[in-house]
Amino acid sequence: MTGRARARARGRARGQETAAPGAVRAAFTSCFVLAVLQISAGFQQVKLGERGGRRRDFHDEGVNTRQLMEHVKESKSGTTGTPIQLTANFFRILSRPQWVLYQYHVDFKPPMESRRLRSALLFQHEETLGAARSYDGAMLFLPHRLHNKVTVLHSVTRNGEKVQITVTLTNELPPTSPVCIQFYNIIFRRILRILNMQQIGRNYYNPGDPLNIPQHKLTIWPGFTTTILKYESAIMMCTDVSHRVLRSETVLDIMANLRQQCGIQRFPEICAKELIGLIVLTKYNNKTYKIDDIAWDHTPNNTFKRGDTDISFRNYYKTQYGLDISDGNQVLLISHVKKMGPSGGPPPGPAMLVPELCYLTGLSDKMRADYRIMKDLSTHTRLTPDKREERLNRFVTHIQKDSDAQAELDKWGLSFDEQLLHLTGRVLRGETIFQGSKSYEYNPMTADWSREMRGLALMQSPPLNNWLMFHTRRNHNEAQSLVQTLSRVSGPLGLRIQRPVVVEYDDHQESLLRALQHNVGPQIQMVVVVLSSNRKDKYDSVKKYLCVDCPTPSQCVVSRTLSRPQALMTVATKIALQMSCKMGGELWSVDIPLKQLMIVGIDCYHDTTAGKRSIGALVASLNQSMSRWFSKCVLQHRGQEIMDGLKMALTAALKDYLKFNNCLPSRIIVYRDGVGDGQLHSVVNYEVSQIMDSIKSIGQDYVPKLTVVVVKKRISARFFYHKNGTVFNPPPGTVIDTDVTRPEWYDFYIVSQAVQTGSVSPTHYNVVYDTSGLKPDHMQRLTYKLCHMYYNWQVIHINVVMYRDKGH
């Protein structure tokens, strides 16, 4: 870190009042705080803090797109395919008959600034309000109606001040109202806390049942994701198994290793680069923090205000948590806590973290690249369908058997169904694959046609005459084996591959970059680089040079992949296919019955590093068989809408389609990925109109049929197939469009692949705009067809989405 950067860090640290996480930043006297605590002692309430950071879960509640599509108003379900009986990780929420949630506004005279004091004064009146109540500082929720619409209560503070509290009924909320849905989630988070589960990020974990992997210095906390929403058939809780990986070494250990590796001079710069942006866990309060900066001039001996006195960080942790800090010279970490300050104001200042007490969460890139670590982790985290279902059932049973949890639910007249939801899905038939002049079927249960395609010529592939292969001296044998095997496998595939010019480089990044600069010219069609390891920085440097500085198709392969002779034919075949694709080859196709159709895929990548820009990506099909694609990436500023940069890209794609086909597409179907919770409003209200503007720019009389589909891959929904007493993953092609879909959306799930281990993840498709009039059956079938067109694997996958993710 430069001297200027250190000065900025010092300025940020000094410019705001700082405190240890969990320390009370007093805005009033200690006697006043004590009075509040005494008044509120013994009262249980659902706190606003239990709602903190959760409101975005419900922002998509108000997006009602289905009502605008006449052809799916009555029914959005398909009928084709073979019915299949499934269970899903959903549990119905049950409530007593005529259940209503009563909402009250609470007013204090004189006004009380402290929300905590307001709660304490209000909850003095338990006889009037009852034991079950939820108060967020302004609104009071009760499971029963008070005798009068306006109830006036009187309280006295500890210092004798009289306070009048007016409680006014403002709303009677039915179980399906958005406020009630949010309220159910608040109550359930209360239940999870009763079960001694700890919130980390958006999920809850059980620190009392850790899974230790000592050989890798890792610990796994098992936990669950939970969301309660209104679905097609009922209000249900969707819950799935989650795992949080914690490292056994502290941030101080990592800093010591960095100092040893890079020396004192470069340590500040390297340390900041490695640590800033990472998430840490402080076990003394089980909270997570993002490292935003490093306070190079702060140590545990520095002090901060606690009440009216100054206390050092070292003494604070000793008195508050009984923790001894061994290294008094370690610098502190800065985390800009997002929580609001008193009365909704800005936070008083950043949290200062002691590295010795912080544990990194998640995995580093180096860990992810370590096969042994990932294999050992997967034995605990990659659950088979039967194990996952068993864990979910055990979770709900635990809630039902815990007396405190049941008492909390009983107070509100709520309960959960004891069993997973049963529903009926449909399995679409497998597709015929067309390759060259041949066609073939595949096993629909495995969704893999790598065997069937062997020995068959591809649809189209340009000859590869001028190409380079780079390798180190140590990897000479592996590189030669790859060249020879590529020659063997290319003939049957109809590929014409000449021998490459082989370039040897020293095994370090600078040497490889120089070798690329000296040898890659405009006449080179392809560059293959054999890497000695899967270090991300080396791979990134190759791709950056060959994508940005000297655009040339490239293929990287790790030498270890080539070291097993028995697998070399398979590996070489896959490499040959990828090389062909990158030069514009077409491998196989499926039957697409819709004519003059353009498929568009849109995604956005957000770099979480401070100050970095987002990247928007668009791909668009150019031919009937969906085997040729237009692609464009654009850099965007943070916060900029994705379509601002991609409007011109879509216009360019339409012009390319016109050149390729001598006509414009009569139908356009856009698959939009990368839409997070709470962002659906933006897609519906902004992006759709931007897409339409791009289309109009071609000509005012050009009005193709348009469909926009939001795709979500990272979802919690899981489905299980029971057969002869055994639990399996649903087969590829399974469609679910009832029960667990949302009533206000035209949405469906597709299981589009088979997995060898663990539980399969379905993909959620939400049609947010549609003038095509396609029946649900046709929309689902077309989407499944496109899943066959991802050329990186000879298996079914989410084609358009994966091409955007890979940047092909």
Regions found by a protein language model. Name each.
Residues 2-808:
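Long, low-complexity, intrinsically disordered terminal regions
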